[in-house]
Amino acid sequence: MGQKVHPNGIRLGIVKPWNSTWYANTKEFADNLDSDFKVRQFLIKELAKASVSRIVIERPAKSIRVTIHTARPGIVIGKKGEDVEKLRKVVANIAGVPAQINIAEVRKPELDAKLVADSITSQLERRVMFRRAMKRAVQNAMRLGAKGIKVEVSGRLGGAEIARTEWYREGRVPLHTLRADIDYNTSEAHTTYGVIGVKVWIFKGEILGGMAAVEQPEPAAQPKKQQRKGRK
């Protein structure tokens, strides 16, 4: 059987950035990695209802900077920033260095693979029919400008005795094209019949220029200069 490489892993450094960006010597590397894992575990558990897409960790000069990408920044920040301050203290305690937490808003959650997968799992846990949940996610993504989307669910679908896999695709999802901006993520729905796995691939277009094009902000549109016609 043909196996697929992880769509995010194969594109790291080409069109996808890392979720942890720091350098460490051999002695500190394992501790930093363990600290990153614990910080992510804590934040994902604490912000389960805040629609968190991804958590980026940086370590500038004996400190830790955590950027939380979320579709609901108000829930993360809390009243007058109280909730985010509590998170900052716990993260600093886990990492053992001063912590800073930044919040980045996800403008279009329908085009974020993690948020789409979480949305489908929450619907499956509320006993919504899996085909309806899949179709709704695909339609919303295509309506908001996705070039292609594929959704796959696996498990005891509809309470069936034998587990199976079903998928639904619309548009293009070119997994072999390295410059293709493909957002991939997974989630799990814990139902009364067992666990149902959800996978989502979203193709947003091709990125020309590699990581340099990803990291550079889009230039602001400049007004066109009107040319004066001279007399002949």
Swiss-Prot record:
A GO molecular-function descriptor: structural constituent of ribosome
Pfam families: KH_2, Ribosomal_S3_C
The entry's keywords: Ribonucleoprotein, Ribosomal protein, RNA-binding, rRNA-binding
Coiled coil feature spans: none
Superkingdom of origin organism: Bacteria
Residue ranges of every copy of the KH type-2 domain listed in the record: 39-107
GO CC term (a single one): cytosolic small ribosomal subunit
CDD domains for the chain: KH-II_30S_S3
Listed GO biological process terms: translation
Family: Belongs to the universal ribosomal protein uS3 family.
Function field: Binds the lower part of the 30S subunit head. Binds mRNA in the 70S ribosome, positioning it for translation.
Subunit comment: Part of the 30S ribosomal subunit. Forms a tight complex with proteins S10 and S14.
Annotated protein name in UniProt: Small ribosomal subunit protein uS3
Organism expressing this protein natively: Serratia proteamaculans (strain 568)
